Protein backbone atom coordinates (compact mmCIF):
# COMPACT_ATOMS: atom_id res chain seq x y z
CA UNK A 1 0.00 0.00 0.00
CA UNK A 2 1.23 3.50 -0.78
CA UNK A 3 1.21 6.01 2.08
CA UNK A 4 1.50 9.77 2.20
CA UNK A 5 2.51 11.47 5.46
CA UNK A 6 1.58 15.11 5.06
CA UNK A 7 1.70 18.37 6.96
CA UNK A 8 4.46 17.44 9.42
CA UNK A 9 7.85 18.85 10.20
CA UNK A 10 10.10 16.24 8.62
CA UNK A 11 13.71 15.47 9.54
CA UNK A 12 15.12 15.16 6.03
CA UNK A 13 18.81 14.32 5.86
CA UNK A 14 20.31 16.64 8.46
CA UNK A 15 17.62 19.31 8.76
CA UNK A 16 13.90 19.83 9.31
CA UNK A 17 11.51 20.76 6.51
CA UNK A 18 7.77 21.36 6.39
CA UNK A 19 6.99 18.80 3.73
CA UNK A 20 5.40 15.45 2.97
CA UNK A 21 6.81 11.94 2.67
CA UNK A 22 5.45 9.33 0.29
CA UNK A 23 6.16 5.63 0.60
CA UNK A 24 5.41 2.70 -1.65
CA UNK A 25 6.41 -0.95 -1.47
CA UNK A 26 8.11 -0.40 1.88
CA UNK A 27 10.43 2.39 0.74
CA UNK A 28 10.35 6.17 0.58
CA UNK A 29 9.71 7.05 -3.04
CA UNK A 30 9.16 10.82 -2.85
CA UNK A 31 9.61 13.77 -0.53
CA UNK A 32 7.71 17.01 -0.99
CA UNK A 33 5.67 16.09 -4.05
CA UNK A 34 1.91 16.46 -4.39
CA UNK A 35 -0.26 13.52 -5.25
CA UNK A 36 -2.68 10.92 -4.03
CA UNK A 37 -2.12 7.78 -1.98
CA UNK A 38 -4.20 4.88 -0.79
CA UNK A 39 -3.58 6.02 2.78
CA UNK A 40 -2.93 9.55 3.96
CA UNK A 41 -1.70 10.41 7.44
CA UNK A 42 -2.22 13.89 8.84
CA UNK A 43 1.04 14.87 10.57
CA UNK A 44 0.16 18.48 11.31
CA UNK A 45 1.81 19.74 14.53
CA UNK A 46 3.98 16.62 14.65
CA UNK A 47 7.63 15.84 14.02
CA UNK A 48 8.30 13.15 11.42
CA UNK A 49 11.51 11.31 12.30
CA UNK A 50 13.36 8.23 11.09
CA UNK A 51 12.56 5.35 13.42
CA UNK A 52 14.86 4.43 16.29
CA UNK A 53 17.38 1.67 15.56
CA UNK A 54 18.05 0.04 18.92
CA UNK A 55 21.09 -2.24 18.78
CA UNK A 56 21.30 -3.22 22.45
CA UNK A 57 18.40 -3.92 24.77
CA UNK A 58 17.45 -6.72 27.12
CA UNK A 59 14.30 -5.26 28.67
CA UNK A 60 12.33 -8.04 26.97
CA UNK A 61 13.64 -10.38 29.68
CA UNK A 62 11.06 -8.85 32.02
CA UNK A 63 8.32 -10.19 29.78
CA UNK A 64 9.93 -13.65 29.76
CA UNK A 65 10.55 -13.73 33.53
CA UNK A 66 8.79 -10.82 35.28
CA UNK A 67 9.77 -12.26 38.66
CA UNK A 68 12.49 -14.77 39.57
CA UNK A 69 11.24 -18.24 38.72
CA UNK A 70 8.06 -16.95 37.04
CA UNK A 71 8.10 -17.71 33.30
CA UNK A 72 5.72 -16.82 30.49
CA UNK A 73 5.51 -18.32 27.02
CA UNK A 74 8.02 -16.89 24.56
CA UNK A 75 5.41 -15.78 22.04
CA UNK A 76 3.50 -13.85 24.70
CA UNK A 77 6.72 -12.15 25.80
CA UNK A 78 7.82 -11.21 22.29
CA UNK A 79 4.42 -9.86 21.22
CA UNK A 80 4.19 -7.76 24.38
CA UNK A 81 7.72 -6.47 23.83
CA UNK A 82 6.84 -5.63 20.23
CA UNK A 83 3.99 -3.42 21.40
CA UNK A 84 6.31 -1.65 23.82
CA UNK A 85 9.05 -0.91 21.30
CA UNK A 86 6.63 0.38 18.67
CA UNK A 87 4.91 2.70 21.14
CA UNK A 88 8.34 4.14 21.92
CA UNK A 89 9.34 4.77 18.31
CA UNK A 90 11.69 1.80 17.87
CA UNK A 91 11.34 0.43 14.35
CA UNK A 92 14.40 -1.85 14.33
CA UNK A 93 15.17 -3.68 17.55
CA UNK A 94 18.04 -6.02 18.39
CA UNK A 95 17.02 -8.13 21.36
CA UNK A 96 20.15 -8.68 23.44
CA UNK A 97 19.97 -12.37 24.32
CA UNK A 98 22.66 -13.52 26.72
CA UNK A 99 23.93 -17.08 26.30
CA UNK A 100 25.93 -17.67 29.41
CA UNK A 101 27.58 -20.50 31.28
CA UNK A 102 24.76 -19.93 33.77
CA UNK A 103 21.64 -22.09 33.63
CA UNK A 104 18.18 -20.54 33.73
CA UNK A 105 17.12 -17.29 32.08
CA UNK A 106 20.50 -16.80 30.39
CA UNK A 107 21.26 -20.43 29.70
CA UNK A 108 21.47 -22.43 26.49
CA UNK A 109 17.87 -23.65 26.36
CA UNK A 110 16.50 -20.14 26.76
CA UNK A 111 18.79 -18.67 24.10
CA UNK A 112 17.73 -21.36 21.63
CA UNK A 113 14.07 -20.87 22.48
CA UNK A 114 14.21 -17.10 22.01
CA UNK A 115 15.99 -17.38 18.68
CA UNK A 116 13.52 -19.97 17.40
CA UNK A 117 10.54 -17.90 18.56
CA UNK A 118 11.91 -14.73 16.97
CA UNK A 119 12.41 -16.48 13.65
CA UNK A 120 8.92 -17.97 13.74
CA UNK A 121 7.14 -14.79 14.83
CA UNK A 122 9.10 -12.27 12.76
CA UNK A 123 6.41 -11.97 10.02
CA UNK A 124 3.82 -11.13 12.68
CA UNK A 125 5.88 -8.59 14.62
CA UNK A 126 5.58 -4.90 13.86
CA UNK A 127 9.19 -3.94 14.48
CA UNK A 128 12.03 -5.36 12.41
CA UNK A 129 13.25 -7.70 15.14
CA UNK A 130 16.79 -9.04 15.13
CA UNK A 131 18.93 -11.25 17.36
CA UNK A 132 21.85 -9.71 19.24
CA UNK A 133 23.73 -12.64 20.72
CA UNK A 134 25.47 -11.55 23.91
CA UNK A 135 28.01 -14.33 24.23
CA UNK A 136 29.55 -14.82 27.65
CA UNK A 137 33.14 -15.51 26.66
CA UNK A 138 33.70 -18.21 29.30
CA UNK A 139 30.82 -20.17 27.78
CA UNK A 140 33.29 -22.22 25.75
CA UNK A 141 30.97 -25.16 25.16
CA UNK A 142 28.69 -22.95 23.05
CA UNK A 143 31.33 -22.03 20.47
CA UNK A 144 30.54 -24.67 17.80
CA UNK A 145 26.82 -23.95 17.90
CA UNK A 146 27.37 -20.20 17.77
CA UNK A 147 29.60 -20.57 14.72
CA UNK A 148 26.84 -22.61 13.11
CA UNK A 149 24.34 -19.82 13.86
CA UNK A 150 26.75 -17.28 12.38
CA UNK A 151 27.29 -19.31 9.22
CA UNK A 152 23.53 -19.65 8.78
CA UNK A 153 23.07 -15.90 9.35
CA UNK A 154 20.73 -16.44 12.27
CA UNK A 155 22.51 -13.74 14.28
CA UNK A 156 22.18 -10.01 13.63
CA UNK A 157 25.16 -8.91 15.73
CA UNK A 158 27.57 -10.70 18.07
CA UNK A 159 28.61 -9.20 21.38
CA UNK A 160 31.39 -10.41 23.65
CA UNK A 161 30.55 -10.22 27.35
CA UNK A 162 32.39 -11.32 30.46
CA UNK A 163 30.56 -10.80 33.73
CA UNK A 164 32.83 -13.16 35.65
CA UNK A 165 35.01 -10.32 37.07
CA UNK A 166 31.97 -8.95 38.92
CA UNK A 167 31.72 -12.15 40.96
CA UNK A 168 35.36 -13.09 41.44
CA UNK A 169 36.70 -13.29 44.99
CA UNK A 170 38.02 -9.72 45.21
CA UNK A 171 35.06 -7.98 43.55
CA UNK A 172 33.46 -5.46 45.96
CA UNK A 173 29.92 -6.26 44.80
CA UNK A 174 30.48 -10.02 44.81
CA UNK A 175 27.98 -11.14 47.50
CA UNK A 176 25.06 -9.19 46.07
CA UNK A 177 25.92 -10.10 42.48
CA UNK A 178 26.24 -13.81 43.25
CA UNK A 179 22.90 -13.77 45.06
CA UNK A 180 21.26 -12.07 42.07
CA UNK A 181 22.77 -14.43 39.51
CA UNK A 182 22.07 -17.57 41.56
CA UNK A 183 18.44 -16.55 41.89
CA UNK A 184 18.21 -15.84 38.16
CA UNK A 185 19.85 -19.19 37.40
CA UNK A 186 17.48 -21.13 39.61
CA UNK A 187 20.19 -22.90 41.63
CA UNK A 188 21.41 -22.62 45.21
CA UNK A 189 24.03 -20.13 46.34
CA UNK A 190 26.59 -22.88 47.01
CA UNK A 191 25.95 -24.59 43.67
CA UNK A 192 26.41 -21.31 41.86
CA UNK A 193 29.70 -20.60 43.65
CA UNK A 194 30.97 -24.05 42.67
CA UNK A 195 29.96 -23.38 39.07
CA UNK A 196 31.85 -20.06 39.08
CA UNK A 197 34.99 -21.76 40.41
CA UNK A 198 34.86 -24.41 37.70
CA UNK A 199 34.25 -21.92 34.88
CA UNK A 200 37.05 -19.60 36.00
CA UNK A 201 39.63 -22.36 35.52
CA UNK A 202 39.11 -22.17 31.74
CA UNK A 203 40.51 -18.65 31.39
CA UNK A 204 43.43 -19.67 29.15
CA UNK A 205 41.04 -21.03 26.52
CA UNK A 206 38.93 -17.89 26.21
CA UNK A 207 41.10 -15.69 23.90
CA UNK A 208 41.36 -18.40 21.26
CA UNK A 209 37.61 -18.92 21.30
CA UNK A 210 36.98 -15.19 20.87
CA UNK A 211 39.38 -15.10 17.92
CA UNK A 212 37.60 -18.00 16.18
CA UNK A 213 34.16 -16.51 16.73
CA UNK A 214 35.35 -13.12 15.48
CA UNK A 215 36.74 -14.68 12.32
CA UNK A 216 33.44 -16.43 11.63
CA UNK A 217 31.47 -13.22 12.15
CA UNK A 218 33.78 -11.20 9.90
CA UNK A 219 33.47 -13.81 7.16
CA UNK A 220 29.70 -13.42 7.28
CA UNK A 221 29.58 -9.63 7.54
CA UNK A 222 28.21 -9.65 11.09
CA UNK A 223 29.10 -6.69 13.29
CA UNK A 224 31.02 -7.37 16.50
CA UNK A 225 30.65 -5.61 19.84
CA UNK A 226 32.71 -5.82 23.01
CA UNK A 227 30.95 -5.18 26.30
CA UNK A 228 32.31 -3.40 29.38
CA UNK A 229 35.86 -2.92 28.06
CA UNK A 230 37.99 -2.19 31.12
CA UNK A 231 41.08 -0.63 29.53
CA UNK A 232 42.47 0.90 26.33
CA UNK A 233 44.56 -2.26 25.92
CA UNK A 234 41.48 -4.46 25.93
CA UNK A 235 39.78 -2.19 23.39
CA UNK A 236 42.80 -2.38 21.10
CA UNK A 237 42.79 -6.18 21.38
CA UNK A 238 39.16 -6.41 20.35
CA UNK A 239 39.73 -3.92 17.54
CA UNK A 240 42.52 -6.13 16.16
CA UNK A 241 39.86 -8.78 15.53
CA UNK A 242 37.54 -6.44 13.65
CA UNK A 243 35.39 -5.53 16.64
CA UNK A 244 34.66 -1.83 16.11
CA UNK A 245 31.83 -1.24 18.57
CA UNK A 246 32.61 -0.71 22.25
CA UNK A 247 29.54 -1.17 24.43
CA UNK A 248 29.60 0.57 27.78
CA UNK A 249 33.36 1.05 28.23
CA UNK A 250 33.96 1.33 31.95
CA UNK A 251 36.48 4.19 31.96
CA UNK A 252 36.91 7.50 30.17
CA UNK A 253 40.34 6.40 28.96
CA UNK A 254 38.84 3.34 27.30
CA UNK A 255 36.11 5.38 25.63
CA UNK A 256 38.72 7.86 24.44
CA UNK A 257 40.81 5.04 22.96
CA UNK A 258 37.77 3.78 21.07
CA UNK A 259 36.64 7.15 19.78
CA UNK A 260 40.11 8.29 18.73
CA UNK A 261 40.47 5.16 16.57
CA UNK A 262 37.10 5.66 14.91
CA UNK A 263 35.34 2.91 16.83
CA UNK A 264 31.73 3.40 17.83
CA UNK A 265 31.09 3.88 21.54
CA UNK A 266 27.68 2.61 22.62
CA UNK A 267 26.22 3.93 25.86
CA UNK A 268 22.84 3.58 27.51
CA UNK A 269 20.09 6.06 26.75
CA UNK A 270 18.74 5.61 30.32
CA UNK A 271 22.06 7.10 31.48
CA UNK A 272 21.13 10.33 29.66
CA UNK A 273 17.51 10.37 30.83
CA UNK A 274 18.39 9.72 34.48
CA UNK A 275 21.38 12.05 34.52
CA UNK A 276 24.02 9.39 35.08
CA UNK A 277 24.86 5.70 35.19
CA UNK A 278 22.79 3.62 37.61
CA UNK A 279 25.99 1.80 38.66
CA UNK A 280 28.22 4.85 38.90
CA UNK A 281 30.17 4.46 35.66
CA UNK A 282 30.89 7.11 33.04
CA UNK A 283 28.29 9.78 32.32
CA UNK A 284 26.78 9.48 28.84
CA UNK A 285 25.98 13.18 28.44
CA UNK A 286 29.56 14.09 29.27
CA UNK A 287 30.86 11.52 26.79
CA UNK A 288 28.59 12.86 24.05
CA UNK A 289 29.69 16.44 24.73
CA UNK A 290 33.31 15.30 24.44
CA UNK A 291 32.75 13.38 21.22
CA UNK A 292 33.25 9.99 22.87
CA UNK A 293 29.83 8.44 22.33
CA UNK A 294 28.30 7.86 18.91
CA UNK A 295 25.39 5.52 19.70
CA UNK A 296 22.72 5.40 22.39
CA UNK A 297 20.80 2.19 23.07
CA UNK A 298 17.75 1.37 25.16
CA UNK A 299 19.78 -0.98 27.38
CA UNK A 300 17.09 -1.91 29.92
CA UNK A 301 14.35 0.68 29.19
CA UNK A 302 12.60 1.04 25.83
CA UNK A 303 11.33 4.63 26.24
CA UNK A 304 14.89 5.89 26.80
CA UNK A 305 16.24 6.47 23.23
CA UNK A 306 13.37 8.79 22.31
CA UNK A 307 13.54 10.64 25.63
CA UNK A 308 17.34 10.87 25.58
CA UNK A 309 17.52 12.63 22.22
CA UNK A 310 15.14 15.34 23.38
CA UNK A 311 16.91 15.59 26.75
CA UNK A 312 20.29 16.15 25.07
CA UNK A 313 18.89 19.01 23.02
CA UNK A 314 17.01 20.54 25.96
CA UNK A 315 20.15 20.47 28.11
CA UNK A 316 22.23 22.07 25.37
CA UNK A 317 24.58 19.10 25.06
CA UNK A 318 24.08 19.02 21.29
CA UNK A 319 21.51 19.93 18.68
CA UNK A 320 18.44 17.78 18.35
CA UNK A 321 19.43 16.93 14.79
CA UNK A 322 22.75 15.52 16.00
CA UNK A 323 21.14 13.83 19.00
CA UNK A 324 18.68 11.97 16.80
CA UNK A 325 21.45 10.46 14.69
CA UNK A 326 22.73 8.75 17.86
CA UNK A 327 19.57 6.63 17.95
CA UNK A 328 18.87 6.24 14.24
CA UNK A 329 21.34 6.84 11.42
CA UNK A 330 24.60 6.01 13.20
CA UNK A 331 23.53 2.74 14.86
CA UNK A 332 21.96 1.59 11.60
CA UNK A 333 25.18 2.15 9.67
CA UNK A 334 27.33 0.67 12.45
CA UNK A 335 25.61 -2.73 12.28
CA UNK A 336 25.42 -2.89 8.49
CA UNK A 337 21.91 -1.55 7.88
CA UNK A 338 22.47 1.48 5.63
CA UNK A 339 18.95 1.20 4.22
CA UNK A 340 17.42 2.86 7.29
CA UNK A 341 17.97 5.47 9.97
CA UNK A 342 17.49 8.47 7.67
CA UNK A 343 14.57 9.91 5.71
CA UNK A 344 15.62 9.93 2.06
CA UNK A 345 14.30 8.63 -1.24
CA UNK A 346 15.13 4.95 -1.63
CA UNK A 347 15.49 4.25 2.09
CA UNK A 348 13.15 2.04 4.09
CA UNK A 349 9.98 3.81 5.10
CA UNK A 350 10.62 3.48 8.83
CA UNK A 351 9.04 6.62 10.26
CA UNK A 352 7.67 7.84 13.55
CA UNK A 353 5.33 10.76 14.18
CA UNK A 354 6.02 12.52 17.47
CA UNK A 355 3.99 15.06 19.45
CA UNK A 356 6.23 17.39 21.46
CA UNK A 357 3.56 19.76 22.81
CA UNK A 358 3.00 18.12 26.18
CA UNK A 359 6.39 18.59 27.80
CA UNK A 360 7.69 15.15 26.87
CA UNK A 361 7.79 13.55 23.42
CA UNK A 362 4.93 11.17 22.68
CA UNK A 363 4.82 8.79 19.74
CA UNK A 364 1.57 9.20 17.80
CA UNK A 365 2.28 6.76 14.98
CA UNK A 366 4.95 4.26 13.96
CA UNK A 367 5.46 3.11 10.39
CA UNK A 368 7.74 0.17 9.59
CA UNK A 369 8.63 -0.60 5.97
CA UNK A 370 5.69 1.50 4.83
CA UNK A 371 3.17 -0.20 7.11
CA UNK A 372 1.38 1.54 9.97
CA UNK A 373 2.04 -0.70 12.97
CA UNK A 374 1.20 1.67 15.83
CA UNK A 375 -1.35 4.48 15.93
CA UNK A 376 -2.46 6.45 18.97
CA UNK A 377 -4.74 8.92 17.16
CA UNK A 378 -6.96 7.18 14.62
CA UNK A 379 -8.45 10.46 13.38
CA UNK A 380 -5.18 11.23 11.61
CA UNK A 381 -5.73 8.38 9.11
CA UNK A 382 -7.60 9.15 5.89
CA UNK A 383 -8.40 7.20 2.74
CA UNK A 384 -6.82 8.11 -0.59
CA UNK A 385 -7.89 11.18 -2.53
Where are these regions (language model features)?
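C-terminal cap of metal-dependent C-N hydrolases
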Residues: 8, 28, 329, 333, ...
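Divalent metal-coordination and catalytic microenvironments
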Residues: 8, 21, 26, 45, ...
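Hydrophobic faces of well-ordered beta-strands that scaffold small-molecule active sites
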Residues: 51-55, 93-95, 129-133, 156-160, ...
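Metal-coordinating catalytic core of metallo-dependent amide/deamination hydrolases
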Residues: 99-229, 299
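Glycine-enriched alpha-helix->loop->beta-strand junction motifs that scaffold or abut catalytic
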Residues: 152-156, 238-245, 260-266, 291-294
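His/Asp/Glu-enriched, well-ordered alpha-helical/loop segment
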Residues: 219, 263-271, 275-356
